[in-house]
Swiss-Prot record:
<keyword id="KW-0812">Transmembrane</keyword>
<feature type="transmembrane region" description="Helical">
    <location>
        <begin position="8"/>
        <end position="28"/>
    </location>
</feature>
<comment type="similarity">
    <text>Belongs to the UPF0060 family.</text>
</comment>
<keyword id="KW-1133">Transmembrane helix</keyword>
<feature type="transmembrane region" description="Helical">
    <location>
        <begin position="34"/>
        <end position="54"/>
    </location>
</feature>
<protein>
    <recommendedName>
        <fullName>UPF0060 membrane protein xcc-b100_1273</fullName>
    </recommendedName>
</protein>
<keyword id="KW-0472">Membrane</keyword>
<keyword id="KW-0997">Cell inner membrane</keyword>
<feature type="transmembrane region" description="Helical">
    <location>
        <begin position="62"/>
        <end position="82"/>
    </location>
</feature>
<feature type="transmembrane region" description="Helical">
    <location>
        <begin position="91"/>
        <end position="111"/>
    </location>
</feature>
<dbReference type="InterPro" id="IPR003844">
    <property type="entry name" value="UPF0060"/>
</dbReference>
<dbReference type="Pfam" id="PF02694">
    <property type="entry name" value="UPF0060"/>
</dbReference>
<keyword id="KW-1003">Cell membrane</keyword>
<dbReference type="GO" id="GO:0005886">
    <property type="term" value="C:plasma membrane"/>
</dbReference>
């Protein structure tokens, strides 16, 4: 598997872990879910933090680039979990963010 594809898949896994970790407390606080949802939420957020440590670039660069993938993944979440269809403007914005991620992560580096 190429380094670019590995990086992208790692970003997506990181985003899913963060989304799950934030969505479960939302279900508890806003939708009347069980307080027990906080346990898998905490585990998911711990996985999220661990996944961030697996990225092979400087942390600031990883966080900046990850934001673009998070936005695109959150829009998929909007569509699949919340059952709200993203608008073309949502998709255009996500495309711009993914382009930014690609520039940040895959541009040539000196030294």
């Amino acid at each position: 598997m190429s380094a670019a594809l590995t990086t992208l898949l790692l970003f997506v896994a990181t985003a899913v872990a963060e989304l799950v970790g934030c969505y479960l407390p939302y279900l508890w606080l806003r939708k009347g879910g069980s307080v027990w949802l906080l346990l898998p939420a905490a585990l998911s957020l711990a996985v999220f933090v661990w996944l961030l440590t697996l990225h092979p670039a400087a942390s600031g660069r990883v966080y900046a680039a990850y934001g673009g993938v998070y936005i695109a993944t959150a829009l998929l979440w909007l569509w699949w979990v919340d059952r709200v269809t993203p608008t073309r403007w949502d998709l255009l914005g996500a495309g711009c963010c993914l382009l930014g991620m690609a520039i940040i992560m895959f541009s040539p580096r000196s030294g």
